[in-house]
């Protein structure tokens, strides 16, 4: 009975750099070969048998963890960029609406300042937040009393 060498799947290309000859080695690369021939095949020679290099499980887990964290970081950055662009789109559409309402209030003719009449007073508090300006208009009516 003649032996046919087993061709097994080698470690993934990215993790192949981390393949080592640590024990336990499970995958046999070839039987009845010299130490030099085993090294030429890129395998490990241990106790007369040529084993395939293995990537330790802790390296595989660590690599997967790095990929997951990097993916979460990229997704977070993309989400923040999208949210910021949405906020920038909302600001220009809101600004003309508040400007129109302030113009309408200012163009109304003031009432005569007679006894018991109500005169509107206009307050314009403004606040700046993260580089954009939100303007709001508060109209209050105060009663004037004659003494």
Curated annotation (Swiss-Prot):
Biased composition (Polar residues): 99-108
Membrane-crossing segments per the record: 58-78
Biased composition (Low complexity): 109-120
Spans within the Extracellular topological domain: 1-57
Cytoplasmic side: 79-147
PANTHER family cross-referenced by the UniProt entry: TESTIS-EXPRESSED PROTEIN 29
Protein name: Testis-expressed protein 29
Organism ancestry: Eukaryota, Metazoa, Chordata, Craniata, Vertebrata
Name of the gene: TEX29
